Amino acid sequence: MEAALKLARQYYLESGQPQRTRFISRHQSYHGITLGALAVGGHAARRAHFEPLLMPNVSRVSPCFAYRGKNAADETDEAYVRRLAQELDDEFQKVGPNTVCAFVAETVVGAVRLLPLSPSVRSTQMI
């Protein structure tokens, strides 16, 4: 993860866009235990002891977990994906789309028990 963060930053430096310093990730996400990975990770308890050392330019959106994340029993997978995509777009607009360096997403969730994304979530809307 550390290398990916640095690669994204370097890309924008080389492209003449040094203002792109923000990262967006998901609440409850796990990307590793290095300082960079903890910074973009969404697990608050894992970050707590290291918070003073972590970069502050990370914001988070809802986790992509339909089992717990759907608003109602009748919300379709497609509607759920649209809602999450809208939330992500809203976050880009909030922080300024020209300041975002990367959206850090998990394509497979769960460090212990793998939770693959449903086919409707693996759309270009979210990844």
Question: What is each PLM-predicted segment?
Answer:
Residues 1-101:
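PLP-dependent aspartate aminotransferase-fold enzymes
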Residues 80-87, 91, 108-127:
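Active-site core of PLP-dependent enzymes with the aminotransferase class I/II
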